[in-house]
């Protein structure tokens, strides 16, 4: 059941789920500990992770080096029994624990049910350490205690588009765009990708349970808003980018039990606390901010919200609902 209601935010949707214990984000295991015969999917390793064709009905892993940044492992699942050329493509961004295998296994039954391809790049901590290099997109570098704007082709954000091109070629796909999904830190990646990659071929953004947000606000200092904090005028995002961003098709998914104000990984800076005391409230604040900016600018807001009942900070719990929104 989906119920539209006002109060929390004008565009927020309530998605009823049966009450059940969902796997918590904290229970995630590192990729290298996932057994080859994992219950929900069969892993196929191709040599030293060379670029290979995707394999229907199996979870595969390969190394992708077709961008200007460091080579990254990529996990993928192609559903069986579907026309792969026509199948929608979804990119899945993992959380701060850098656990794409776990995330992907939680998505396999839904991808098979709805018939879409899932591609999960792995931004390992050894190469993309901390939030600046991963969920903030590695837009800014730091040297000798000074920040600088990095070459765009080396941003973490910049791995996605060439990886999509690679997938289209390997699959023989006719798809011209994709869905971009992320949970937790991956959700932070997704909503900031929307700002920094306006020309990307994303059909729909699915941002789930982010811990904190870059608000569409030119007066708030980055990374909590668009205002330049480093004296790098060329890096500042302004009104035009806000206008573009709030018109994009984005669904903000929030578990109604993701309300632990003392969660060990929840950011508690003064700026983050202004967004709300926990993830659920911060997500609602972000959605409200997008609609407020759209109203101010006189444009139609493309942002919607989905509240997932009886789910806390769980990628698997969110996936049951998010899968229905893949385009």
Task: Give a label for each model feature.
Residues 140-171, 178:
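Alpha/beta-hydrolase active-site loop
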Residues 124-154, 265-266:
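Cap/lid segment of the alpha/beta-hydrolase catalytic domain
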Residues 23-89, 101-102, 113-114, 145-148, ...:
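A domain-start/cap signature at the N-terminus of enzymes
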Residues 82-87, 92-129, 215:
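Short substrate-entry loop that stabilizes the transition state in hydrolases
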Residues 253, 264-267, 284-327:
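C-terminal catalytic histidine-bearing segment of alpha/beta-hydrolase fold enzymes
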Residues 203-292:
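The feature captures the conserved acid-bearing segment of alpha/beta-hydrolase catalytic domains
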Residues 13-21:
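C-terminal segment of classical bacterial N-terminal signal peptides
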């Amino acid at each position: 059941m989906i119920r539209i209601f006002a109060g929390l935010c004008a565009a927020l949707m309530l998605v009823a789920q049966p009450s059940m214990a969902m796997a918590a984000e904290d229970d995630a295991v590192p990729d290298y500990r996932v057994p080859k015969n994992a219950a929900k999917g069969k892993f196929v390793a191709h040599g030293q992770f060379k670029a290979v064709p995707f394999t229907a009905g199996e979870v595969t892993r390969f190394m992708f080096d077709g961008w200007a940044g460091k080579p990254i492992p990529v996990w993928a699942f192609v559903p069986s029994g579907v026309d792969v050329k026509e199948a929608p493509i979804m990119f899945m961004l993992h959380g701060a624990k850098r656990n794409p295998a776990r995330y992907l296994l939680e998505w396999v039954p839904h991808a098979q049910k709805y018939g879409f391809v899932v591609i999960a790049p792995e931004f390992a901590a050894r190469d993309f350490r901390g939030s600046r290099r991963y969920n903030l997109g590695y837009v800014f570098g730091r040297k000798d205690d000074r920040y600088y704007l990095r070459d765009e082709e080396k941003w973490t954000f910049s791995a996605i588009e060439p990886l999509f091109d690679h997938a289209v070629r390997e699959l023989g796909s006719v798809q011209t765009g994709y869905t971009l999904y992320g949970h937790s830190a991956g959700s932070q990646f997704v909503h900031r990708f929307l700002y920094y990659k306006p020309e990307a071929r994303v059909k729909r953004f699915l941002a789930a349970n982010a811990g904190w947000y870059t608000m569409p606000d030119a007066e708030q200092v980055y990374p909590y808003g668009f205002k330049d904090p480093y004296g790098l005028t060329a890096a500042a995002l302004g009104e035009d980018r806000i206008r573009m961003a709030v018109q994009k098709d984005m669904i903000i998914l929030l578990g109604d039990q993701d309300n632990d104000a003392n969660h060990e990984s929840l950011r508690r800076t003064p700026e983050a606390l202004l967004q709300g005391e926990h993830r659920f409230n911060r997500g609602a604040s972000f959605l409200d901010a997008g609609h407020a900016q759209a109203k101010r600018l006189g444009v139609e807001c493309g942002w919607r919200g989905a509240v997932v009942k009886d789910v806390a900070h769980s990628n698997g719990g969110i996936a049951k609902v998010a899968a229905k929104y893949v385009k």
